[in-house]
Regions:
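Conserved ATP-binding subdomain of kinase catalytic cores across diverse folds
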Residues: 1-102, 115-126, 137, 143-146, ...
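General "foldedness" signal
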Residues: 45-47, 72-79, 105, 130, ...
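Short, low-complexity, polar/charged sequence segments that are solvent-exposed and flexible
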Residues: 50-55, 107-113, 167-172
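Conserved kinase catalytic-core helix
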Residues: 101-132, 148, 178-190
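C-terminal catalytic region of ATP-dependent kinase domains
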Residues: 142, 146-223
């Protein structure tokens, strides 16, 4: 996949742990861009998970690599270092969406809930939490059409991933028994995960030799 050149940096966003940047690319679309602040490991995790998630039919917004020109970064002043003049990960900005709330749980298709739960367990992503007390599900909701959008995978492939914590805090943890303890449901999920594996190799192969976030591809280590 060829990287799109960023033609305008609009602002730094307030949402998100790493506060990504809203940018306009050469295709005139708006993207949420993550750069150096996300860390090279996090950027690679985003890239790999976006491919794997799409292969599993998860509703992940269109994504791309973004080339950020040095002159645009310099114009940001001190904040420019958080983005960096390098290759960034871009997720297309979606309109008409809001942060996912626990009240919307019942509106999410049960098959999609289980598919996402299996995916997050598979890629060791514990960063999708939500309960009555709050949390950070890294999900968006489009009320028109009851559509879920899945975002933010920079903390996947976590070396300190703890299954017990994951199953206690995941936004869709209520589906864990029906998914993992039912032979038919788990066999179906496992087959889907297995079928998605080729997209992992495709994602690796499509990363530029120059790297994402300035780290050469040969140095990527996720596990």
């Amino acid at each position: 996949m060829s990287a799109l050149r960023v033609v305008e940096i609009l602002r730094r966003m307030e949402q998100g742990r790493t506060r990504p940047f809203l940018v306009r690319a050469e295709d005139d679309a708006l993207y949420v861009a993550k750069g150096r602040e996300t860390t090279q490991r996090g950027l690679v995790a985003e890239w790999l998970c976006a491919h794997l998630g799409r292969a599993l039919d998860l509703p992940i917004p269109p994504f791309t690599l973004l080339e950020v020109p040095a002159e645009l970064v310099a114009a940001l002043g001190a904040e420019g270092g958080a983005l960096g003049a390098s290759t960034a990960f871009g997720s297309r900005l979606e309109s008409g969406v809001q942060d996912f709330a626990i009240a919307q749980l019942r509106n999410v298709d049960v098959a999609l809930r289980r598919r996402l739960l299996a995916f997050d367990w598979w890629v060791e992503n514990a960063d999708r939490t939500l309960s009555e007390l709050g949390g950070n599900p890294n999900l968006l909701w489009r009320a028109a059409g009851d559509a879920l959008l899945v975002i933010d995978h920079n903390l996947a492939f976590d070396r300190e991933f703890d299954e017990s914590t994951f199953f206690a805090t995941h936004v869709f943890h209520g589906d864990a028994s029906a998914l993992f303890e039912d032979w038919i449901n788990w066999t179906d999920a496992a087959n889907r995960l297995r079928a998605a594996l080729p997209s992992f190799d495709e994602a690796l192969a499509s990363m530029p030799d120059s790297g994402i976030g300035s780290t050469p591809r040969r140095r990527y280590r996720l596990v």
